[in-house]
């Protein structure tokens, strides 16, 4: 069984967000981490590997420095890694990104393809389902549990107020929630092994059945018009009054803010 996991190197937004003048994220000025939903998807794949002996390959699209998250994944237990990087792929929105990844996947053998639900630098949750559409694969999103059953997978899919249990024949695509599991840590031996392994690097020429018009910035139907950090909330006000005075004070504040 072959499992491919799509991971992404993203800025660690917990340390604050920085933007370029054109509204895009200033990734060079921020720490980079493996996207949390993707890491949960990787852990799910590694648990299937532990149970079945499956081969796990990690795939990412990004700058050459994204090699770091691929090596982190191999240190956790992934067998192989593929980096898709090329200048012509830069500036891609979700459509161009999914087109690129689908073009790479057409060169690979896989039974199961796992992505994270969404990346914390965009929160669109579009790339996984779009890849499935490009490749004609069944897709189950928002996975809270994944089990292999012969030539099928059984997935517990999270909804707002309930769970659905779904079964799909492989090959198929699953998008994983960060709540799916607690990802394992890298081991010292895994780190040494990951440093010795080679990462396969693919460029535009390695993408199969893809038109240049669907790649990178020029292949992106959407563009960032404006981006900004969250506006900090004002500090709360604490008052120490008796009940009658508190009511009068609150009514006055509500009127002042035109709430009543």
What do the PLM-derived regions correspond to, one by one?
Residues 1-260:
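N-terminal glycine-rich FAD/FM-binding segment characteristic of electron-transfer flavoproteins
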């Amino acid at each position: 069984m072959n499992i491919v996991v799509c991971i992404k190197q993203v800025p660690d937004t917990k340390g604050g967000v920085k933007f370029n003048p054109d509204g895009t994220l200033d990734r060079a000025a921020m720490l980079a981490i493996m996207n949390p939903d993707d890491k949960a998807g990787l852990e799910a794949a590694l648990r299937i590997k532990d149970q079945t002996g499956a081969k796990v390959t990690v795939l990412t699209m990004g700058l050459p420095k994204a090699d770091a998250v691929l090596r982190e994944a191999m240190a956790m237990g992934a067998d192989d890694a593929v980096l898709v990087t090329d200048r012509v792929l830069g500036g891609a929105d979700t459509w161009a990104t999914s087109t690129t990844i689908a073009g790479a996947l057409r060169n690979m053998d896989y039974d199961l393809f796992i992505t994270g639900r969404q990346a914390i630098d965009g929160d669109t949750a579009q790339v996984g389902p779009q890849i499935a559409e490009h490749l004609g694969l069944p897709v189950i999103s928002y996975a809270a549990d994944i089990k292999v059953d012969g030539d099928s997978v059984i997935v517990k899919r999270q909804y707002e107020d309930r769970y659905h249990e779904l079964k799909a024949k492989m090959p198929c695509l699953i998008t994983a929630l960060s709540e799916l599991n607690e990802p394992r840590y890298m081991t010292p031996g895994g780190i040494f092994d990951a440093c010795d392994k080679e990462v396969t690097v693919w460029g535009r020429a390695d993408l199969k059945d893809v038109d240049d018009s669907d790649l990178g910035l020029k292949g992106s139907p959407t563009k960032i018009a404006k981006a900004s950090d969250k506006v900090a909330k004002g500090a709360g006000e604490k008052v120490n009054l008796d009940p009658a005075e508190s009511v009068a004070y609150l009514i006055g504040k509500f009127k002042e803010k035109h709430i009543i």
